[in-house]
Amino acid sequence: MKIPLANLLKKRQQVETAFLQDEIIGIIYLMTEDMVLHGGTAIWRCYSGKRFSEDLDFYSPTFPSLTKHFEKIGSSRGLKVTEVKDTGNVISSTISNGKTSVKLEVNHARKVEGSITTYELADGIGIEILSLTPDQFIEDKIDAYSNRRYVRDLYDIYHLVKSYRIMASTRTNLKQFLQTVQRPVDEPILKSIVYMGLAPTFDRMVDEIRRNIA
């Protein structure tokens, strides 16, 4: 029998955050069906990741017209939406329930066709949402790691390459990526966000990625 996520997380604050993420997901899919979840939380919840992630990141061209409705529904459930900003491409906000908060970012400038994917709720139940494929995530994470060298991005690549069949074109891009990959700027933090098993070292992740794409 599968153990619910809430029982696996290391910290109470992580559990509270996970349940708040689920509540926000529920509100979002009440309003629209075009929201495509991406980022670290999507990999964690949709692709059996073992890395805790705080933020919710979406693609949706329709969200700008729904922000007031989102705030209204959230308020009716005791949630507070603050720090709302629109850069012209991305709407960001912070959603709080009095115990914890989650940052929500919606890219409304980029239209992405999502794939129907099972999202695992904190209580262990699965629901269908739109997200990216493993190959799409890897391409995004290659770009992210190349730009900022955060260990979480390399870990996500490592997890996906180990766990899923990857397209030939993605393997080619990974081989090119590994030729010049540099150490992360924040490697020690991985131990605090990987909540099951050992946190792999940089060398272990690079070796494992290379082995799986050979």
Regions found by a protein language model. Name each.
Residues 1-35, 46-56, 61-214:
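Structured mid-to-C-terminal alpha-helical surface segments
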Residues 37-42:
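Glycine-rich beta-strand-to-loop/alpha-helix junction loops that act as flexible
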